[in-house]
Curated annotation (Swiss-Prot):
UniProt keywords, alphabetically: Iron, Metal-binding, Oxidoreductase
Residue intervals of the DPH-type MB domain: 4-60
Taxonomy of the source species: Eukaryota, Metazoa, Ecdysozoa, Arthropoda, Hexapoda
UniProt pathway: Protein modification; peptidyl-diphthamide biosynthesis
Cofactor entry: Fe(2+)
Encoding gene, per UniProt annotation: Dph3
Assembly, per entry: Component of the 2-(3-amino-3-carboxypropyl)histidine synthase complex composed of Dph1, Dph2, Dph3 and a NADH-dependent reductase.
Protein name (record): Diphthamide biosynthesis protein 3
Length: 86
């Protein structure tokens, strides 16, 4: 079992859309980080690349599952449209 420095709600993280990463300030001066992909897979621990601290991320896994399902449906529709054009 991990010992968490803190428990932080996902809403308190900063989201970088380009990198699809969530960031939260670490006491060491760097930032805790966790990727959107890790959250979709059910990961709940954000790590700091500069020190040994970890935090538990509080979030609703269903929120990310629904978003993943939406993306899959959109990609499928785009694929169908490309086939229709040819």
């Amino acid at each position: 079992m991990s010992i968490y420095h803190d428990e932080v709600e996902i809403e308190d993280f900063e989201y970088d859309e380009e990198e699809e990463m969530y960031y939260y300030p670490c006491p060491c001066g760097d930032r805790f980080q966790i990727s959107k992909e890790e959250l979709i897979e059910g990961e709940e621990v954000a790590t700091c690349p500069s020190c040994s601290l970890v935090i538990k991320v509080i979030y609703d896994p269903e929120m990310f599952k629904a978003e993943e399902d939406e993306e899959s449906a959109l990609n499928e529709k785009l694929g169908d449209l490309k086939l229709e054009k040819n």
